[in-house]
Amino acid sequence: MAWLGNDCAETIALRADIDAVTFDDAPHHRCGHDYHTASLLGAMAYLKDHQQELRYNVAFIFQCAEENTSGAKALVQHGLWERFPQRPSAIFGIHNRPELPVGVIGVHQGALMAEKTDFRVVFHGQQGHSSTPEKCIDPILPAAQFALELSNLVSHETSPFDTAVCSVYSFHSGTEDNAAPLHATLTGTIRTLRHGTHQHLKERLSDLAQAMALAHRCTVEELSWMHDVPLLDNSAALYPRAYAAAAAAVGEEHVTDVAPCLGGEDFAVYMQDVPGFFYWVGSGKGGDAPVSPWHSDGFAVEDGYLGTAISLLTKLIL
């Protein structure tokens, strides 16, 4: 964290995430957070050189652990806002976007990124040999049925006009080919753009797990929720300021309204305390060039990204 002041009446926070992702069992910057860090450092250096021109004091936040969505929560819990001489009245953040060409900035008023919750469900059965199934309670059956039925929660219990994802992405059970295991463990995620929908899906997921266990004589040994991230809802009050800064940085013709997505971003945690706005900053080649997404081995940030990002961040302050 850092602070730059000019005795201004208001303080604005700027945040960059700094962590890498694990790829082939080693840390790599396959999501561009190194560029986010460099952007904020560049903005800090420029603003320091123009300190007497500041319209706002600036709180700089360099945040770890965005990828596992725990970093922002940890900073807030450890008194982030109290560490600055003046509490910020707003916070702004950026993330590169390979689908947008360099020189384009994506903005959106309202819900931009999903509320996200990861879940873990453990079904408990009774071990036994495959030759005597009547003496076993196989936890794989209810776990598999649970995974299949989850898709029905979205298709049959949410409005077709309401965006939601509810999916299983890992399934682990057993080590032998001739014995019923004791446990079957599933993990997955719920992502929505409305809090009410999110709460409904969590309740129904719990109901479904218990029903599948009962139908197959198992028990639900564990149902836990992990890595909750709130809805990232860009402030309507900040939108004019955010749009003006983007237009000043790249020209109004290069500012585009973007659709919401179901990715999770723990920048939303800060927005529980202060109004916030989050941008997409183009990092792709544009045109007909293939897009290498985040977390892929072909991911790269194109030249010119840093200039756009630094300009945007400084325009928010000067």
Where would I find each of the regions flagged by the language model?
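Short strand->helix junction
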Residues: 7, 21, 65, 195, ...
